């Protein structure tokens, strides 16, 4: 159950961080305006809070593991929001990152 909660928090964090960055991108690069930028900044702030809800107490471990989720989530976001089509190397890289996240976050640790 702890792994499921942790994975759900990683997904929530990714939605807020990637979504927030995308909103800022839309506001600046696509000239959608300050409301988009403001919403993006708020979403990025929520991301920072969601990351603190992880059950593991180690900041470095949480953020390093989250990096794998961020990579895969960014590609998925691009597919859904912008019609981006990742190539086999994008997918391979994302899978490697997710494997690294799994090892960092969920490998058995004796006494830790």
Curated annotation (Swiss-Prot):
Membrane topology of this protein: Multi-pass membrane protein
Entry keyword annotation includes Aminoacyl-tRNA synthetase: no
Location in the cell: Cell membrane
Transmembrane feature ranges: 8-28, 33-53, 62-82, 91-111
Keywords in alphabetical order: Cell membrane, Membrane, Transmembrane, Transmembrane helix
InterPro entries referenced in this protein's UniProt entry, alphabetically: UPF0060
GO CC annotation, single: plasma membrane
Pfam families found in the cross-reference section: UPF0060 (PF02694)
Annotated family: Belongs to the UPF0060 family.
NCBIfam families found in the cross-reference section: PRK02237.1 (NF002586)
Entries under PANTHER family matching the protein: UPF0060 MEMBRANE PROTEIN YNFA
Protein name: UPF0060 membrane protein SAV_4756
Organism: Streptomyces avermitilis (strain ATCC 31267 / DSM 46492 / JCM 5070 / NBRC 14893 / NCIMB 12804 / NRRL 8165 / MA-4680)
